[in-house]
Amino acid sequence: MKPSMLAKLDQLTERLDELNVLLMQEDATSNMDNYRKMTREHAELGPLVALYGNYRQADSDIQDAQGMLSDPDMKEFAQEEIAAAKTRMEQLEIDLQKMLLPKDPNDDRNIFLEIRAGTGGDEAALFAGDLLRMYSRFAERNRWQIEMVSESASEVGGYKEVIVRIIGFGAYSKLKFESGGHRVQRVPATETQGRIHTSACTVAIMPEADEVEDVNINPADLRIDTYRASGAGGQHINKTDSAVRITHIPTGIVVECQDDRSQHKNKASALKVLAARIKDVQLREQQSKEAATRKSLIGSGDRSERIRTYNFPQGRMTDHRINLTLYKLDFIMDGDLTELTNALAAEHQAELLAALGDAN
């Protein structure tokens, strides 16, 4: 293991010892915010330091076994011990490297999922509806909640644009690599000649900001317009100006929300989406710089990139970033995304490990 990594692990071991002392003090709970912060840090460091203890024990076993090599009766046993300990150390070093990777601070956050129909007209709108169902089913499998924030329905079904809020621990960590262009190849229901059409949608996954204030939105930078909601009709439609459109003048970002009958609730929802979009712009700029350094395709934040193709006649899904093809499209469209999300996370982790190795 590289000296820089050993030094880091020694430092974290000392920090855990320090936390043990601090948490045992009588006045540890006098400041509950600080106490919770320390307990979280303790919980994160515990498994890492335990693993490092196993690594040091394996190193110690090698030293002990090497001392027996000069004894003819113990030489064979010592060689076996050294080989076994070296194998353990190699695996432990890999595990320690993974645990030392910086944690994405947004991983545990709720998200806003935005799907926009692109090229392909009605078929693209229908596919946007299919994608929303796919992600909704995945959310259900993870026992997350889904809230409709904004929708622009298509006349033939599906959506021209739809935004939902997904509430659940780790939602961003599992879906953050879904942003980008999603292409579908299939025969539309209206196609009489049986020809395959190609359509596309753009997906954006945006971590929810803790508070709107976190993103530092200046009220003077906002233009807020109200208008009458449009919808399927009924006694509550078009009676009041309940729909809200917010424009963030510096960035040109526009958010509309009309799904609630209350203008106040629509404004609150629109502000949350606006905060998430501004945070997302900042995050993508950062990801783009980091990805360029790593020459990475995953997590680059590039929405224009076509990341995936769904081919219905062949029953396959291909993720172009990692050259992964799965022939279980029906299951995937029903929300079975675990194999895919795990593969993307593993590849991203491998890129981070490679970058960590270069840095050391």
From Swiss-Prot:
GO terms for cellular component: cytoplasm. InterPro entries: PCRF (IPR005139), Pep_chain_release_fac_I (IPR000352), Pep_chain_release_fac_I_sf (IPR045853), Prokaryotic/Mito_RF (IPR050057), RF-1 (IPR004373). The keyword Cytoplasm applies. Keywords: Cytoplasm, Methylation, Protein biosynthesis. Coiled coil: none annotated. The keyword Aminoacyl-tRNA synthetase does not apply. GO terms for molecular function: translation release factor activity, codon specific. Gene3D superfamilies: 3.30.160.20, 3.30.70.1660, 6.10.140.1950. It comes from the Bacteria. The modification N5-methylglutamine is found at Q235. Methylated by PrmC. Methylation increases the termination efficiency of RF1. It is found in: Cytoplasm. PROSITE patterns: RF_PROK_I. It holds the Pfam family RF-1. Belongs to the prokaryotic/mitochondrial release factor family. Peptide chain release factor 1 directs the termination of translation in response to the peptide chain termination codons UAG and UAA. This is Peptide chain release factor 1. It comes from Janthinobacterium sp. (strain Marseille) (Minibacterium massiliensis). The lineage of its organism: Bacteria, Pseudomonadati, Pseudomonadota, Betaproteobacteria, Burkholderiales. The gene is prfA.
